[in-house]
């Protein structure tokens, strides 16, 4: 009899401990969800890292293709913008090797708008995708046949919008345009593509560094904080988590 009472007490104690653990886990999950919702809120997060670090600051993202922006900064751009940063996203190429510039540019703007970044904050330099432009060879857009900067219907390339003419496809002109767009907006923080195995990633990474070398020599008082980031693509059967784009960007 006494043994049965002891067993029942032991089972009751185990059950109480188990229920306490379950309640503790649920409490942690609720707190996590609450804080996550704050991060996703359109109002931003008061007194957060983003508020203290980026409020009233200028942030510029410089990438080759119309998906690299999400790969290197998709998690940080929305809270930066929501907490008062002036965000600009600069695409160096039209991503037009396999599809039209319009398709890639529309996708980019639509994706950024879903993250809260308006279309007017997006800049297209209008250079070709997948060429040997960076090593001094003649370059043409695969989809349009053009040999100068351009943008899809309803969009403008930066050089034409700023100077009234299109820029020929040369490595030097890309460096010039990156230098120009940085000096025009003078961002406090720059997130730029890093050097990897992709031809355009390498080319834009080097072009950015050449542009920054010029800027730092000319403008000794301008010293933005620069973060170089890799744009990593998934390989193999990763369809569950891969971005589904019309263009199926490489």
Where are these regions (language model features)?
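Charged/polar, low-hydrophobicity segments characteristic of intrinsically disordered regions
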Residues: 117, 240-247
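N-terminal Lys/Arg-rich, disordered targeting/topogenic segments
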Residues: 1-13
């Amino acid at each position: 009899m006494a043994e049965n009472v002891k067993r029942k007490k032991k089972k009751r104690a185990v059950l109480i401990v188990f229920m306490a653990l379950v309640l503790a886990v649920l409490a942690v999950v609720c707190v996590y969800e609450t804080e996550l919702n704050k991060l996703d809120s359109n109002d931003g997060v008061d007194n957060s890292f983003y508020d203290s670090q980026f409020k009233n600051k200028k942030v510029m993202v410089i990438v080759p293709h119309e998906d690299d922006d999400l790969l290197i900064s998709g998690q940080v751009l929305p809270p930066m913008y929501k907490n008062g940063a002036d965000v600009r996203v600069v695409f160096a190429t039209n991503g037009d090797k396999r599809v039209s510039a319009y398709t890639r540019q529309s996708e980019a703007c639509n994706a950024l708008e879903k993250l809260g970044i308006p279309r007017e904050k997006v800049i297209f330099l209008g250079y070709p995708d997948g060429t040997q432009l960076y090593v001094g060879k003649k370059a043409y857009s695969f989809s349009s046949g053009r040999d100068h900067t351009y943008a899809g219907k309803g969009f403008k390339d930066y050089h034409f919008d700023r100077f009234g003419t299109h820029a020929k496809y040369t490595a030097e002109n890309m460096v010039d345009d990156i230098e120009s767009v940085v000096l025009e907006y003078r961002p406090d923080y720059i997130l730029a593509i890093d050097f990897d195995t992709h031809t355009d990633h390498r080319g834009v990474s080097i072009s950015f560094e050449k542009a920054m070398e010029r800027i730092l020599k000319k403008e000794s008082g301008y010293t933005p904080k620069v973060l170089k980031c890799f744009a990593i693509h998934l390989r193999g059967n990763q369809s569950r988590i891969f971005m589904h784009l019309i263009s199926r960007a490489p």
